[in-house]
């Protein structure tokens, strides 16, 4: 059954309708079924329930409805009209007769997450962001998904906050932000992680390996892989994309790729494939569009990313791209957030101070030293914001860094850099903070 479970009158401002879109051969041009909550009825055409009979339910609060199977190629959509933009908790009751599976959840036409449905029947919950006015929530069967029957759902305004970490490469989210990630998760809030590139400069087969390493590292910190967005662009090309006078020009990355990809073996497809049905090209038009759609759809309360003051071009221009998107959404759509910028690759190669251990092999936990002059980009070390990590949080950060085998130990075409990576196991993390 498909039921909107608004069991009290708190959400009178929310009006929902729903329509199922199946392949044309299945519906034979029929009008899409309408779920009219205002009228207190649910109606479904035969292309939905494979029957010529319409199913009606005049008592939605009684827990009745229409079962809707979401199979390959299908989509279930619900329109909404709300008076105030906010994060909402969507609870979804389902029946999954197969193995553990997923379905794509879309908000206003853009991919939000893959919802996990364990084998059997039950209820799962996701936190989404709905904008003021009219919009649409959809469940779509995506690559890697399973056949799931949706039974009912309900929406409640959420008290959770959403933080987003935008990382140029797989490991930057841990080196710079593992402490903030842990504190956010411990507070019961949500962390989304956006991976701009696949970190595949040294080896064209390295991308999926690094994606899996990040997945394991984030799992150590309590972040589920469903909260990872793999943009899947080429390593060391963000500057070229950002500075190109023609945003439509397609670049070949050093890896040899010219279009986005993810790791299908982990059910982590690239964002553009999930969102639009095909990979994006390595051009700034697609890169900017993907980044804009992710941030605009999620509307995180806080965004963490790397610094314009770094020597690494992906970090420097990744920051510029994130800042540009936030400024545009703030100006054009009234989006408000806090942007936190931190440093991974300082100008001085001796920074950060390497990790030291005592005679028993236990790490000595010390604070970061100021890494370098800010490269003429106006970063004042007297105005930096610091957070303090507990011993347990530092040890978890160390364990998360352990997961990056390629970056710590190297590969056939490159050396590892474990000394640099573990040097980020410090008592503090630091940011320059901008409020929009």
Feature map (PLM): residue ranges:
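Bacterial N-terminal signal peptides that target proteins for export
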Residues: 2-15
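Bacterial N-terminal signal peptides
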Residues: 15-23
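Sec-dependent signal peptide cleavage junction
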Residues: 24-34
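Extracytoplasmic
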Residues: 32-158
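Active-site rim/loop-helix segments in enzyme catalytic domains that contact anionic ligands
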Residues: 156-297, 320-345, 381-383, 400-403, ...
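Proline-aspartate-enriched helix->loop->beta-strand connector
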Residues: 291-310, 315
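C-terminal regulatory/interaction regions
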Residues: 323, 390-394, 398-436
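A conserved mid-domain beta-alpha-beta active-site/ligand-binding segment of alpha/beta enzyme cores
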Residues: 352-407
């Amino acid at each position: 059954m498909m039921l909107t479970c608004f069991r009290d009158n708190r959400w009178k401002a929310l009006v929902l309708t729903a329509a199922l879109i199946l392949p044309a051969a299945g519906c034979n041009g029929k009008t899409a079924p309408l779920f009219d909550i205002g009228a207190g009825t649910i109606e479904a055409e035969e292309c939905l329930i494979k029957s010529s009979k319409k199913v009606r339910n005049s008592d939605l609060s009684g827990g009745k409805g229409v079962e809707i199977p979401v199979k390959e190629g299908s989509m279930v959509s619900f329109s909404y009209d709300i008076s105030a933009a906010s994060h909402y908790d969507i609870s979804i009751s389902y029946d999954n007769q197969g193995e553990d599976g997923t379905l794509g959840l879309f908000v206003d036409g853009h991919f939000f997450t893959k919802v996990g449905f364990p084998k059997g029947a039950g209820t799962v919950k996701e936190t989404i962001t709905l904008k003021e006015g009219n919009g649409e929530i959809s469940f779509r069967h995506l690559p890697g998904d399973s056949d799931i029957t949706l039974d009912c759902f309900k929406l409640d305004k959420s008290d959770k906050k959403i933080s987003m970490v935008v990382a140029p490469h797989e490991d930057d989210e841990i080196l710079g932000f593992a402490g903030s990630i842990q504190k956010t998760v411990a507070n019961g809030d949500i962390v989304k992680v956006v991976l701009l590139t696949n970190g595949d400069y040294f080896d064209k087969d390295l991308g999926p390996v690094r994606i899996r390493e990040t997945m394991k590292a984030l799992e150590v910190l309590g972040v589920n892989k469903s909260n990872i967005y793999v943009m899947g662009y080429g390593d060391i090309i963000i500057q070229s994309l950002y500075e190109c006078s023609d945003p439509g020009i397609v670049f070949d990355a050093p890896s040899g790729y010219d279009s986005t990809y993810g790791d299908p073996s982990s059910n982590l497809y690239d964002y553009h494939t999930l969102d639009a049905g095909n990979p994006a090209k390595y051009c700034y038009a697609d890169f900017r569009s993907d980044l804009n759609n992710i941030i605009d759809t999620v509307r995180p309360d806080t965004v963490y990313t790397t610094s314009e003051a770094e020597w690494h071009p992906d970090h420097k221009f990744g920051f510029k791209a994130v800042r540009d998107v936030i400024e545009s959404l703030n100006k054009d759509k009234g989006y408000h957030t806090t942007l936190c910028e931190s440093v991974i690759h300082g100008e001085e190669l001796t920074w950060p101070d390497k990790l030291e251990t005592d005679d028993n092999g236990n790490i000595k936990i010390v604070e970061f030293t100021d890494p370098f002059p800010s490269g003429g980009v106006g970063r004042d070390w007297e105005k930096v914001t610091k957070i303090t990590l507990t011993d347990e949080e530092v040890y978890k950060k160390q364990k998360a860094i352990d997961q990056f085998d390629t970056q710590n130990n190297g590969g056939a075409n490159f050396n590892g850099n474990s000394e640099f990576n573990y040097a980020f196991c410090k008592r503090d993390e630091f940011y320059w903070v901008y409020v929009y």
